[in-house]
UniProtKB/Swiss-Prot annotation:
Gene3D superfamilies listed in its UniProt record: UbiA prenyltransferase
Species of provenance: Avena sativa (Oat)
Protein name: Chlorophyll synthase, chloroplastic
Gene Ontology molecular function terms on file: chlorophyll synthetase activity
Cofactor(s), names only, from the UniProt record: Mg(2+); Zn(2+); Mn(2+)
Name of the gene encoding the protein in the UniProt record: CHLG
Cofactor: how and how many bound: Magnesium or zinc; or manganese at a lesser extent, but not calcium.
Length: 378
């Protein structure tokens, strides 16, 4: 599975999890004991035990690699990627750039909700740095560590991905994990100094999201083994954490916003479930209790759309109750097309139409997030 932090977070999605997975995807953070271990079953990563020769070994293409693949898919880190031997392209693939936009958007929503963002050079620059922390650094960290611990699943579902295929060595993967993590935390600390915070809230959001990402993917907790807890953690990483980071950067993170974004994270749970359907075979084989495995595809697809739709309708009702009539109507207007697309694609066949459904429905969802952010800023 792939995995969403204030940035990071969550997402993790296109690999064995899905496109929304682990997400400012402030997501996982490996402890200092993270090491590289060559055994097929790795509770931890043990760089110290890795053969030094692996760092210089050239990437290889498996004998059974697909005859053709898309270079574009490879760069985005999604299924159907072309086999690549360029180590930097492989590194980029592991970070799954396709999962960065939700985190970047979350930062934008948080900045809008603060009511204090201005189109000045300084504010725009600060927001870009926050987006870099949430997307390339912390989401990239989350996706890489998720792929590391998912290699057994990927060996079943997508055996030609970089790690199970041997296209990148163990030491190279571990190095990437630490560079992205430390880079993201460093940017978080820089943003706190830049914003003049007495308490380094952005740094701690990044640290917390990184830890969440780690326990999402790694044993012994491995939250993703539970469909409810894992997918909610993913939703929070992709929606809540980046929003909080953006709002804290330009304003004050208030309790009502925390509650509202946690509610929205339930919709993120539903979106994360979409990605579980394509991994049902590998999840069942390895004992992961994703919702499609636990409840069956028919029930799980209704849980999925229910989480997405009921959450947005609840937020619209909340906005209406606070006198934000036009914002509530706008959110309702953005929810209706999602329901139509669910019946048109997802509910018919969640495996066949998962990509088409997400590509067509998610734009309405993310604009609904922005509508909510603008409503709370007034």
């Amino acid at each position: 599975m792939a995995t969403s932090h204030p940035l990071a977070a969550a997402a993790a999605t296109s690999s064995s999890s899905a496109t929304f997975r682990p997400p400012l995807r402030f997501l996982s953070s490996p402890p200092s004991s993270l090491t590289l271990n060559r055994r097929r079953s790795f509770p931890v990563v043990c760089a110290a035990d890795a053969d030094a020769k692996e760092t210089t070994k050239k990437p290889t293409i498996p004998d059974k690699a697909p005859a053709a693949g898309s270079s574009f898919n490879q760069l985005l880190g999604i299924k159907g990627a072309k086999q690549e031997t360029n180590i930097w392209k492989i590194r980029l693939q592991l970070t799954k750039p396709v999962t960065w936009p939700p985190l970047v958007w979350g930062v934008l929503c948080g900045a809008a909700a603060s009511g204090n963002f201005h189109w000045t050079v300084e504010d725009v620059t600060k927001s870009i740095v926050c987006m870099l922390m949430s997307g390339p650094c912390l989401t990239g960290y989350t996706q890489t560590i998720n792929d590391w611990y998912d290699r057994d699943i990927d060996a079943i579902n997508e055996p030609y991905r970089p790690i199970p295929s041997g296209a990148i060595s163990e030491n190279e993967v571990i190095t990437q994990i630490w560079v992205l993590l430390l880079g993201g935390l460093g940017l978080g600390a820089l943003l706190d100094i830049w914003a003049g915070h007495d308490f380094p809230i952005i740094f701690y959001l990044a640290l917390g999201g990184s830890l969440l990402s780690y326990i999402y993917s790694a044993p012994p907790l491995k939250l993703k083994q539970n469909g409810w807890i894992g997918n909610f953690a993913l939703g929070a990483s992709y929606i809540g954490l980046p929003w909080w980071a953006g709002q804290a950067l330009f304003g004050t993170l208030t309790p009502d916003i925390v509650v509202l974004t946690c509610l929205y994270s339930i919709a993120g749970l539903g979106i994360a479930i979409v990605n579980d359907f394509k991994s049902i075979e590998g999840d069942r084989t390895l004992g992961l209790q994703s919702l499609p495995v636990a409840f069956g595809m028919e029930t799980a697809k209704w849980i999925c759309v229910g989480a997405i739709d009921i959450t947005q309708l609840s937020v619209a009702a909340y906005l209406l109750s606070t006198g934000k009539l036009y914002y509530a109507l706008a959110l309702l207007g953005l929810t209706i097309p999602q329901v139509i697309l669910q019946f048109q694609y997802f509910l018919k066949d969640p495996v066949k139409y998962d990509v088409k459904y997400q590509a067509s429905a998610q734009p309405f969802f993310v604009f609904g997030l922005l509508v909510t952010a603008l409503a709370t800023s007034h």
